[in-house]
Amino acid sequence: MDILTKEELKENSLEKEKFFEELIYIFKYEGQIRELILDYKFNEKSYMYKTFVNFLLKNKKIFENIKKYDKIIPVPISKKRYKERGYNQSLLIAKEISMQISYETNNNIKLELVNNCLIKTKNIIEQSKLNKEDRQHNIQGVYTLKNGSILTNKSILLIDDIYTTGSTVNECCRVLQQAKPNKIGVLVLAKD
């Protein structure tokens, strides 16, 4: 488990600029964790999201950090990918985090799920099939912002499953910056 600042992430990155303040993750993307996440994502094991969220929120440091955010946004997937998979793995995680934060704080903290602002507009080659350099180019211009005014001056937590090169979350955050939020953080299950 770790929380990394954008400065710490820049040291090992191809991207010149990070459009988010911090990266929160619970696992290293290796071994059995890697297999579990891949099963969750690609092998119709959508039910696993609750277990992953329980691991995340049992960590006091992560729980306290998440409570500082106003809005939670999943990385969107294309309609084609949704049709193939039957679910958006990041949306399931985001919904569960939002519900559990509200429950655990007796509704004193509302981490509002926003699933209609960040839109994936293009089908692209899966990032997992590309090398680091190609991932950056593949993801550019894929997302658009809709109804961004509800994010203005808010703290946003973007949810994804895996952080490999950071290209996907960085592009999402670049687009979200158009709404002029106070802060954007990224939470993933695992970091490569």
Language model features with spans:
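Glycine-rich phosphate/pyrophosphate-handling loop used in enzymes and phosphotransfer proteins
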Residues: M1-D192
